[in-house]
Amino acid sequence: MAAGTHRMMVLVDTTVWIDFFSAKPEPHVNTFETLIADREDICICGVILTEILQGIRDNAEFSQTRKLLGNMIYLPMQVDDYVRSAQIYRHLRRKGITVRKSVDCMIAAVAMAHDVFLLHNDRDFLPIKKHFGLKAL
């Protein structure tokens, strides 16, 4: 990283982590690998942590993954973020847009509250980007 440049802070969605751990050759995985190589600030939030860990069956892999994710920058959710999440969901619903997983509204609310980019591979974030200015990669 060049002197005087700022690191990019990126909240990495569960969809990207899963494909990364599975070594899938997908564009979002390539972007994630570039962020890691460039030593950008990789962030996680509680919802993403839960989604990743709940899908792991093997105890050793669970412990290893928990340790790895514990090294990420943790973005906490405040009460206002939960309210914002509900507002996002309700606003899109009034426009006839159904977000399939309400946790995606929570993840978007965290990203927006902390003013970080969201790296994802989930179409639920597209209308949030369009209607709320979510900074998505």
Where are these regions (language model features)?
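Active-site neighborhoods of divalent-metal-dependent phosphate/nucleic-acid chemistry enzymes
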Residues: A2-H6, I73-L119
